[in-house]
């Protein structure tokens, strides 16, 4: 089954607060943020863009690695997410721009950024337009580092295949919804292509003038307890369809009761490192 995406609801205060609370209490976004920041060549960076930066989880990771004189610009179209970020992350090196990722080049000078980092969001955008905007604002030699959920990229880490010992929490949610509410999940489409495979990414990056210099399929290890907390965030709550949030939380609680809290849950990611070619000598 194609993974459920979360496109709408990011600019609602209740969601922004729940999302930020999750990032503070659980390691999931902190871990992926630090992984991307580590790959972004930030030791001598002057300007770094946190693209689709939300409430600032990735900005925190970037700020820990850049020099004291450097700047971070966090760009996101959800003002609610940025309001939470402004309240909770007050580093003077960080500024916020409320804008769609596709309009990034409207807000930064050409060839001004040393790196652009995008965590857990690129597949929600018009990637061809975003890649072109990133290429416009990156300096020659600058890096663009992002990740794509394995279900959207069509990849799975070996740990994702071997760690599971029973039904996933998502599968149990669908089961409970079917039994208690007559829910019928969307039909499986085994032949459906992934939304954003590496081949498509590479073609679009090349068209934008960027070169793929590294890729890796990674595994993020968590627990059923962390997965439950993540699924409590309104934009991620399941199942899809005509349910209230309260109903979804009741379904989640019933499904979670059928699991072991510390049972392993593994998420696959495709990490991509691209670079704007250096100017010819």
Residue ranges and their predicted role:
Residues 47-51, 55-104:
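Class I SAM-dependent methyltransferase SAM/SAH-binding core
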Residues 1-43, 57-61, 81, 145-178:
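Conserved class I S-adenosyl-L-methionine
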Residues 114-128:
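A short SAM/SAH-binding and catalytic strip from SAM-dependent methyltransferases
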Residues 106-116:
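A short acidic, Gly/Pro-enriched loop at the edge of an enzyme's catalytic core
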Residues 129-140:
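A short glycine-rich, Lys/Arg-flanked "PGG" loop and its adjoining helix->strand segment in the class I
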Residues 192-208:
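Short alpha-helix
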Residues 213-263:
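C-terminal helical/coil "lid" or tail adjacent to the Rossmann-like core of SAM-dependent
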């Amino acid at each position: 089954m194609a993974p459920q995406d979360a496109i709408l609801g990011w600019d609602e205060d209740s969601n922004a607060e729940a999302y930020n609370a999750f990032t503070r209490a659980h390691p999931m976004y902190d871990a992926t943020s630090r992984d991307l920041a580590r790959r972004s060549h930030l030791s001598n960076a002057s300007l770094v863009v946190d693209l689709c930066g939300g409430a600032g989880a990735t900005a925190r990771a970037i700020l820990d690695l850049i020099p004291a004189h450097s700047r971070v610009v966090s760009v996101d179209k959800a003002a609610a997410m940025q309001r939470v970020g402004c309240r909770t992350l007050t580093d003077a090196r960080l500024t916020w721009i409320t804008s769609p990722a596709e309009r990034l080049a409207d807000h930064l000078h050409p060839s001004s950024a040393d790196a652009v980092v995008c965590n857990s969001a690129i597949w929600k955008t018009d990637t061809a337009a975003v890649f072109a905007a990133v290429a416009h604002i990156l300096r020659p030699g600058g890096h663009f580092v992002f990740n794509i959920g394995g279900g959207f990229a069509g990849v799975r880490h070996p740990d994702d295949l071997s760690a599971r010992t029973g039904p996933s929490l998502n599968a149990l949610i669908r089961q409970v919804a079917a039994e208690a509410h007559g829910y019928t999940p969307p039909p499986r489409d085994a032949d459906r292509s992934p939304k954003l495979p590496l081949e498509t990414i590479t073609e679009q990056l090349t068209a934008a003038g960027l070169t793929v210099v590294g890729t890796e399929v990674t595994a993020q290890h968590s627990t059923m307890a962390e997965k439950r907390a993540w699924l409590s965030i309104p934009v991620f709550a399941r199942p899809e369809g005509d349910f209230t949030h309260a109903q979804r939380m009741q379904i989640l609680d019933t499904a979670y009761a059928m699991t072991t809290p510390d049972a392993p849950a593994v998420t696959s990611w495709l990490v991509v490192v691209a670079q704007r070619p250096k100017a010819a000598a």
